[in-house]
From Swiss-Prot:
Primary role: Functions in the biosynthesis of branched-chain amino acids. Catalyzes the dehydration of (2R,3R)-2,3-dihydroxy-3-methylpentanoate (2,3-dihydroxy-3-methylvalerate) into 2-oxo-3-methylpentanoate (2-oxo-3-methylvalerate) and of (2R)-2,3-dihydroxy-3-methylbutanoate (2,3-dihydroxyisovalerate) into 2-oxo-3-methylbutanoate (2-oxoisovalerate), the penultimate precursor to L-isoleucine and L-valine, respectively.
Active site: residue positions: S466 (proton acceptor)
Cofactor(s) this protein cannot do without: [2Fe-2S] cluster; Mg(2+)
Pathway(s) annotated for this protein in UniProt: Amino-acid biosynthesis; L-isoleucine biosynthesis; L-isoleucine from 2-oxobutanoate: step 3/4; Amino-acid biosynthesis; L-valine biosynthesis; L-valine from pyruvate: step 3/4
Family as reported in the entry's similarity comment: Belongs to the IlvD/Edd family.
Database matches in PANTHER family: D-XYLONATE DEHYDRATASE (PTHR43661), D-XYLONATE DEHYDRATASE YAGF-RELATED (PTHR43661:SF3)
Name of the featured protein: Dihydroxy-acid dehydratase
GO MF annotations in UniProt: 2 iron, 2 sulfur cluster binding; dihydroxy-acid dehydratase activity; magnesium ion binding
């Protein structure tokens, strides 16, 4: 066991003494050491309940002959960080979490890990850190939040972001907005739609890293506690079997997860996180081109918020990820999982599917996959749109650019009534390096939707979008403006041509004009010159490479 390096022999007498000071016994030291990686925090609703899950996981470890050690990572709530400088820290926090998991597990000689994340960057961050060690691990995602209800109608967090836009144009009163505020977020769990946190939980299960039904079992469901306990027991078996993550995370496993993502219409942020996770196994193991290639293989089969009417609870009751795998089984390749059964065995074991929620491949919600990669002179290395949440009339759109050099400038313009039908809003210098931190543009996209402009106005950015964004929102434009990308050359009035069916995005300018404009820009001046974000800005790769640190 790896932990023998910490606890075995006379030379480790001081090490054992320190463990005994924590209450561990000689008998405990004969067993596998299992790290319980918790991300409990009192400021994030997705993580407020994780103490209960960590206790259950520890019980499972003890019951099956292991010794658990709990430690914590940070966890940022994207919703609370949204719309201000705090959002610059969200994506960069993924790397801090990965470093923390790697450091703690290696320093203390853990033989295996139970990862307990919920929200957006915490799920990939923990997995990335654990992969660097290549020791057995299992993931217990914290589970979705139930939607709230007011006057017979269901609400969730995105209802409030869009509600701000509705209030601005007089669709609702301030009193009505306050009532929705008080009920929309019903308690513990990740936001109730297929946003980034739940998208990553679904893909974690599809990768084979969580037990079946873990992704969609809700935070307040006792089944989540039982899954945590079972996962604690399972990790001890995995350590004894030496089932390493690289035995599970093959190229085929990643492609399975991408197919599930495309079929469900998950968050565009998955195109950052899946390549970043794969990068811990091998450089460019999975790239944006894999999403592009696989998007031609599956249709969009589930109409889930923000692009549809259903919530995560509906997906769960329809059969969860096993049911999705069952529907896609002709495309899925067989791979190992932490469950002990293969991914296709799990798919074949499904007893019930609600085909009103999880459509058959031959009767999809949309013929095209839920995500689309676009390329052209505006984004030579690619950009991403959640086409499953776009009005069909905006699949193809040509319009004049209105250019803003930050999210804050754009929000002021939108709420100030400066955007009209047909416009293409361009928000730049918000990329991984330029932002820095690649902020999510949920506030401007929600304002556009709330004001009823989502079927006539497009938005493109080198930043990114919340999983809750809907409408013609095209993000991750690469190269970014700070790196001299073409998006930096766009001026007000330039015609932007978008064709989501043909996967193209271009600015109607001659190459000579683009080169001339870029040559006049000079070298990008970093916005932040000290602290973590200053270091991050210098080291981060482009969005098409997963925004990983070089």
């Amino acid at each position: 066991m790896i932990s023998d390096n910490v606890k075995k022999g006379v030379i480790r007498t001081p090490n054992r003494a320190l463990l005994k000071a924590c209450g561990y016994t000689d008998e405990d030291m004969e067993k596998p050491f299992i790290g319980i990686v918790n991300s409990f925090t009192e400021v994030v609703p997705g993580h407020i309940h994780l103490r209960t899950l960590s206790e259950a996981a520890k019980h499972g470890v003890y019951a099956n002959g292991g010794t658990p050690f709990e430690f914590n990572t940070i966890g940022i709530c994207d919703g609370i960080a949204m719309g201000h400088e705090g959002m610059k820290y969200s994506l960069p926090s993924r790397e801090i979490i990965a470093d923390a998991v790697e450091s703690m597990a290696r320093a203390h000689g853990f033989d295996g890990l139970v990862l307990i994340p919920t929200c957006d960057k915490i799920v990939p961050g923990m997995i990335m850190g654990a992969l660097r060690l290549n020791i057995p691990f299992i993931v217990v995602t914290g589970g979705p939040m139930l939607p709230g209800e007011f006057q017979g109608k269901k609400y969730e967090l995105i209802s409030l972001f869009e509600g701000v836009g509705e209030y601005q144009v007089g669709k609702i009163t301030e009193e009505e907005l306050k009532c929705i505020e008080d009920c929309a977020c019903s308690g513990a769990g990740s936001c109730a739609g297929l946003y980034t946190a739940n998208s990553m939980a679904c893909l974690t299960e599809a990768l084979g890293l969580s037990l079946p039904m873990c992704a969609t079992t809700h935070a307040v469901d006792a089944q989540k506690v039982r899954l945590a306990k079972k996962s604690g027991s399972k990790i001890v078996d995995m350590v004894k079997e030496d089932l390493k993550p690289t035995d599970i995370l093959t190229k085929e496993a990643f492609e399975n997860a991408i197919l599930v993502d495309l079929a469900l219409g998950g968050s565009t942020n998955t195109t950052l996180h899946i390549p970043a996770i794969a990068n811990e196994i091998e450089n460019k193991f999975i790239t944006l081109d894999d999403f592009d290639r696989l998007s031609d293989e599956v249709p969009h089969i589930a109409s889930i918020k923000p692009g549809g009417e259903h919530y995560m609870i509906d997906l769960h009751n329809a059969g969860g990820i096993p049911a999705v795998l069952n529907v896609l089984k002709e495309k899925i390749r067989d791979t190992k999982t932490v469950d002990g059964r293969s991914i296709l065995e799990i798919a074949e074991s499904v007893k019930y599917i609600n085909y009103d929620v999880i459509r058959k491949v031959e009767a999809p919600v949309h013929e095209t996959a839920g995500l689309r990669v676009l390329k052209g002179n505006l984004a030579p290395n690619g950009c991403v749109v959640k086409i499953g949440a776009v009005h069909p009339k905006m699949y193809k759109h040509d319009g004049p650019a209105k250019v803003y050099n930050s999210e804050d400038e754009a929000i002021s313009a939108i709420l100030g009534g400066k955007i009209v039908e047909g416009d293409v809003i361009v928000i730049r210098y918000e990329g991984p390096s330029g932002g820095p931190g690649m902020r999510e543009m949920l506030s401007p996209t929600s304002a556009i939707c709330g004001m009823g402009l989502d079927d006539s106005v497009a938005l493109i950015t080198d930043g990114r979008f919340s999983g809750g964004s809907r409408g013609p929102c095209i993000g991750h434009v690469s190269p970014e403006a700070a790196a001299g990308g073409v998006i930096a050359a766009i001026e007000n009035g330039d015609i932007i041509k978008i064709d989501m069916i043909e996967k193209e995005i271009n600015v109607d300018l001659d190459e000579s004009v683009i080169k001339e404009r870029l040559s006049k820009l000079g070298e990008f001046e970093p916005k932040i010159k000290k602290g973590y974000l200053s270091r991050y800005s210098k080291l981060v790769s482009s969005a098409d490479e997963g925004a990983v640190l070089k």
